[in-house]
A protein has these predicted regions:
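Membrane-embedded transmembrane alpha-helical bundles that form the catalytic cores
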Residues: 1-480
Length: 481
């Protein structure tokens, strides 16, 4: 089920809110059970058979958590068995991911090498499996580390793993973030209104901006294989996808955070205007923050992080993290190469001491431009169906081969969508958020902004709904991961 669908907006969400605040208002247990069943229904709406995969994951990780906690508390000085259980839990979770996400890819490539000696499988990918599996893994690991208390109520743990706002495409919520909120939370009028505001921002970003950028990007990537793309349209298409993936993914996070707020949950931010970054390392502190923190805390730091005896080990740790990051995003060589690209860029920055090495404003600005270009090239890899398409597209961007500089398709699409590019570029700088915070410090302006905000969000909602009713392009990119 999509957040940006008529059924979700006008049926599912209103019904869940009604039962949550009216029927179940006196019991936290009843509220949590309602949200759990709503979440299972939400997931089963599009993939009824795969809800069993998630239930198996929930049950298994509940048992792993209980077993580890029992060993740690009953045998304080004998945590060896607890460690074995932890390893088994990691193997179990990674096995689920491998079977559903990587087995097809692995067998296909092995058959290329060994002349089709393995049967080819066509296992379908459960939506959001990477997200709820990483949440489940982090919970069990944190129980072992004693950074969270074990959740003894299986329904509450099930709610944590399956909660519908962040189930499909994040953010990856740590159990420590909502540990207390699961059993005790309140929703004030300010919380609910802020949740609505944040949800409407996300809905507008998705339907009005991301979906329109997608029309440009899809056209560019669809025609590139026929060598019919000009240099100008190749660049326009790549920038369109750069904008699309930001507004698409951050929109989902906005809606997830807003929905969570409506029900009393406060999730951490997942994006912080990444395209204004002055370096690649800063970009990854601003982009998909929850994933970066997950790999930092559960892979990079356990390997030794940057506190290892020499830079060779630092580079090794970066290589492992970014290879895994690429693989996490999908079973395709394009994602693996995308991860390795960021490994190379981050290793370069680590070795050279960038951006701290720059002293002049000009050098910092130039490196910020370089960073954006590298991110843009990375998204070409990310969007391409295979390495061949990525190579052809990048060649077209640099005018290599039989391509022309500019064509009618560029004029057509730029003429039709230039306003979306302008609004997207301005919004991605964070200037709107900055001005809102500064002006809100003045009482009279704060009241004016609040009044105008209601009108603006109402208009944006109506425009978004009109797009949805017309059946506009709508799926979220990160549903595939």
């Amino acid at each position: 089920m999509l957040f940006s669908s008529v059924f979700f907006l006008f049926a599912f969400l209103p019904i869940v809110l009604f039962f949550y605040f009216i029927v179940c208002k006196r019991s936290m247990l009843a509220k949590n059970i309602l949200l759990l069943f709503a979440s299972l229904f939400f997931y089963a709406w599009g993939e009824p058979k795969f809800v069993l995969v998630m239930i198996v994951s929930i049950v298994a990780n509940y048992i792993f958590g209980i077993a580890i906690n029992k060993q740690l508390t009953a045998y304080e000085n004998k945590g060896r068995l607890a460690k074995i259980i932890l390893v088994l839990s990691v193997i179990f979770n990674l096995s689920i991911l491998f079977i559903f996400k990587y087995l097809n890819f692995t067998l296909f490539n092995l058959n290329l090498i060994f002349k089709n000696i393995f049967p080819q499988t066509e296992i379908l990918l459960p939506i959001g499996i990477s997200f709820f599996t990483f949440q489940a893994m982090s919970y069990v690991i944190d129980v072992y580390r004693k950074t969270v208390d074990v959740q003894k109520n299986p329904l509450y743990l099930a709610l944590y793993i399956s909660f519908f706002p962040q189930l499909i495409a994040g953010p990856i919520v740590r159990y420590s973030t909502i540990e207390e909120q699961i059993s005790s939370r309140t929703v004030t009028g300010a919380d609910f209104s802020e949740g609505i505001r944040r949800f409407l921002i996300g809905l507008s970003k998705k339907v009005i901006l991301a979906n329109n950028f997608a029309l440009v990007a899809d056209q560019a990537f669809n025609i590139v294989g026929n060598n019919n793309i000009s240099i100008a349209f190749a660049w326009l298409g790549s920038i369109a996808y750069t904008m699309q993936i930001f507004f698409d993914f951050s929109a989902y996070s906005d809606m997830a955070i807003g929905l969570g707020r409506m029900f009393g949950f406060k999730f951490l931010e997942n994006f912080n205007y990444p395209y204004v970054s002055s370096s690649v390392s800063e970009f990854w502190r601003r982009w998909h923050i929850s994933l970066g923190q997950w790999f930092r805390d559960y892979v990079y730091i356990p390997l030794g992080g940057s506190r290892v005896p020499n830079k060779v080990l630092v580079i090794r740790n970066l290589l492992i993290v970014w290879l895994l990051t690429g693989i996490w995003h999908g079973a395709n060589w394009t994602f693996i190469l995308w991860g390795l690209l960021y490994f190379a860029l981050l290793a370069f920055e680590k070795i050279m001491g960038i951006p701290n090495k720059f002293e002049s404003k000009q050098s910092k600005v130039l490196y910020a431009i370089f960073t954006f270009l590298m991110v843009n090239f990375g998204w070409v890899l990310f969007r391409s169906n295979n390495l061949l398409q990525a190579g052809i597209y990048l060649k077209a961007m640099f005018g290599l081969g039989d391509v022309i500089g500019i064509d009618n398709m560029f004029y057509q699409y730029f003429g039709e969508y230039w306003m979306f590019f302008f609004v997207g570029a301005v919004y991605s700088t964070g200037i709107f958020s900055y001005l809102r915070k500064r002006l809100s410090k003045i009482d009279i302006l704060d009241r004016i902004i609040e009044f105008l905000g209601i009108a603006v969000y109402t208009v944006l909602f109506l425009i978004s709904v009109s797009y949805l009713v017309m059946g506009a392009y709508n799926p979220f990119i990160y549903f595939n991961f």
